[in-house]
């Protein structure tokens, strides 16, 4: 009646889905592209949200100002200690609102991440009020 999901669950987990596709676990690599958000820069508010403490989930290799490629390479080295057999990664644009920039800048950053040979996809953390139709159309065009 239910599909045979690998973890013995009756739903499809994110990790299980990728494990079936790639034959292994995928690891997210946190990328800090130097974004801010409208609740920090004064457009909506100042100081940010109480739940958005990036220092709590910001690994040492993820530093704004470093290239995306350098952050990916250093992230792979960092995670290889624990996950030696992982060969495929997701570039996770995590800090603040990662669509809070003009589309040409987003295309540049996301394309740099997607061009890395070990990166099979991107994950984008953002606010819904920082995404417009133009950005969604471009993201939908990615294969």
Which residue ranges define each predicted feature?
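Distinct, well-ordered alpha-helical segments
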Residues: 103-111, 132-142
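Sterically constrained small-residue positions within well-ordered secondary structures
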Residues: 20-22, 84, 115
């Amino acid at each position: 009646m239910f599909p045979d999901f690998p973890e013995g669950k009756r739903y499809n987990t994110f990790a299980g889905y990728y494990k079936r596709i790639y034959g292994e676990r995928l690891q997210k690599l946190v990328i800090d592209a130097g974004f801010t958000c409208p609740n920090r820069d004064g457009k909506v508010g100042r100081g940010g949200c109480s739940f958005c403490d990036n220092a709590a989930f910001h690994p040492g290799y993820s530093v704004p100002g470093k290239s995306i490629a350098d952050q990916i390479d250093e992230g792979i080295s960092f995670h290889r200690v624990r996950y030696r057999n992982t060969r495929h990664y997701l570039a996770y644009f995590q800090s603040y609102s990662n669509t809070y920039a003009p589309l040409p800048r987003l295309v540049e950053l996301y394309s740099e991440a997607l061009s890395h040979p070990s990166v099979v996809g991107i994950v984008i953390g953002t606010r819904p009020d920082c995404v417009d139709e133009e950005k969604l159309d471009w993201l939908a065009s990615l294969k």
